[in-house]
């Protein structure tokens, strides 16, 4: 395919136009008075959302250079969402502000590499100040406030705080759709580990990229499975029962994997295969934990158990399993409560005996998985469109609350960035274009607060100047239009969200500024369809 190449200013301006189109669509959603965006779907009803990353994903531009610019900013939103579950719109606003200021300086003759160094130094300094500003989450109310702001709904914040209180910060919180109206919290014993399906063909829900099975059998094997001959006896027994199967093994490959995939695709037999978590002795121990939790046995030749001789009573059971590309959750295993408690006590004893911090940390993780459990938030709504949007917001709010527990909380509403900037730049000793790079960051830090004010119908510049002049920790409550002590009013953000948004935005901005050429696919001109044959002269 032929390529188009643009250089210098033409290349950068093309990227900027694409970035601006995407950022302008996303930034209207920022803050409590942010608007919604309607996304057309090829099938079904349109989606209404105020989630930055969902909007960004939908935007596809026609111009090749603009398309690349938009894709780069999508990466900012996606990366921030992956790390912290929120802050996608903030990251987009920051990236747009940095690129706009940066390109102005590059056009005026500044050295892009020096600007990049200045931006990186300034961002590191501001990130450090943000972590100093952060206060540890001490109360259930603070978790509720953080999650409420992310979801835009106080009732969501309360239910997430309740869930975290019950399962602890090590526990797992999942969100499910419900047929009833409103929100429900269901606490279930369960376990999650960091291994996903071996093949994407095992998915049952392509939209969420998950394999979800109710009431499955769970086969736990401490070896590789490559021959289908070894698997057949137990597969036949499970197929007769009509239940799905989760296989956890060191690896599944060759004809064994091919057989499972073919049967799954044809709809003959539902199954999903995942690799066992951990390595070496730790893997053995974790497989043992899963076996006790599900009431099964670890099939291992070390203890004289062969795969072709497995009976149904050696296979574990659970109420539900959810497998994504990265992790597996086993909900409500059918294991004996006494045996599970015995295993928990054994791990606690090992923690007390261990003198290695690393071993102790890994044992603590195993303990949390066995004893922590899973909280399920069931969400219902009047329409399918509202249900999807609400569920997505709650999932983001859960990640947001976990981020708050991890690195602490800072004043919300874009104020933390403005106030961290007040002290961060005093320590920097930069000259020339590097100092200009730092100045670009300083100007960009006002962006989120300015946009929140604009979305609330206020004058952005006036609000930013007012916040700079008032007491630290105080800022705009955009919902009421007043200036308050943000922490006391529960207007807070996780430090991790704010820090990730800034770091990801600066990373992409630096790439924009140092771009000297863009190579894009040349759009193909589709030839017009040939004219059809004439109808001829016909008499009737």
Swiss-Prot record:
PANTHER family registered for this protein in UniProt: 60 KDA HEAT SHOCK PROTEIN, MITOCHONDRIAL (PTHR45633)
- What Pfam families does the entry give? Cpn60_TCP1 (PF00118)
**Disulfide bond positions:** none
Keyword line: ATP-binding, Chaperone, Cytoplasm, Isomerase, Nucleotide-binding
By what name is this protein known?
Chaperonin GroEL 1
**Which source organism does the UniProt entry give?**
Salinispora tropica (strain ATCC BAA-916 / DSM 44818 / JCM 13857 / NBRC 105044 / CNB-440)
Any idea which positions bind ATP? 29-32, 86-90, 413, 477-479, 493
This enzyme's EC code(s): 5.6.1.7
GO MF term list: ATP binding; ATP-dependent protein folding chaperone; isomerase activity; unfolded protein binding
Q: Where in the cell does this protein reside?
A: Cytoplasm
